[in-house]
Amino acid sequence: WQARIRFTNVRVPRENLLHKEGRGLIVALTCLNYGRCTLSAGIAGAAARAADQSTKWVQTRYQFERPLAEFELVQQRIARMYAYGYALDSLLYMVTGMLDRGDTDIMVETAITKVFSSQIGWEIVDDALEIMGGEGYMTENELERLWRDSRIHRIVEGSNEVMQPFIFGYGGKQLAEQMMGIQQAMSWDGDESFGQNVKRIVPNMVNPALLKRAIPLATELFLGFVPSAPAVSTENSWLEPFALRLSKLIQKHAHLFKMASKWHKEEIVIRQAVQARLSDSATFIFALSAMVSRIDSQTSTNDQNLTRDKVYFEHAFELLELRIHQQLAELRINADKSMRKAAETARTYNNSLPNSEYYIHETSPSAKG
């Protein structure tokens, strides 16, 4: 159960302060950072165990005089489990490294870690259950508990539906503020008089500092000139093609983030489906960055698992690359309009059902259970 506690004129002895006065929110957010990483570590461990157990099963379980692992659709799930497992570990290593280093402003990074781990971890365990078939449901075969427990991870430590708009909003805050500042300085405001608009816009049109920011943005938004892709460097030459692909993905994501802001204007604040796509794209890009960094380090140190992990890395890279392209493509081609209509229709129908026959939250302001 949860409850609200209100403090009125409470005096706290100085020796009881947990941190510094006025810095309590920082303490709370720091706890969230650690909680999201420890949760993700547990998810990674469960996913690894599920992959090992289910693969052992299909290696030794025969159908049609062949082990199940020889069938391509089963192999697809095996490959996906181990590839995504590598991605999970890579992201976790990177972000927990930031924590150990003492980085302070990593709320977006830990939120990304939580969202990615809870979603991908669930997919791994679900694949494991699928290839074990009905045996996966049996308590003695271990996966039943892993599968059941994995579902809660997308809800706790900040549900993914809350984290996605947060990643979008906080992660894109600087760019959004820059775009809004330019718009306010140089766009016509219908609430102002003609003279007020002219007085504001004309000086800004010859302001060198403002023009330096506005011209590249305008050419990108209205003329389609996309800025150069950022440089992604690696120590080992075999990774250069992957670094280039990652660079192109970053370029595409950054461009479409700006374009989405142009397409939806002020409504982007309430278009959570759009926000979620951009958030997921950023999440997968960050995971790819962690993977490239990790495999680069493994190559340089000739890690004992390098040969195996290179195979997992390459498959995970392609899987996440495809997911990024899909998320960005759906910014323009999607079912959002019909979704909103269907949801409204369903809500209207649901309102016709008697409240007395359903469980309703005890604090509901609109109905009693």
Set out the residue ranges of the language-model regions.
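Flavin-dependent oxidoreductase catalytic core characteristic
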Residues: 1-75, 79-369
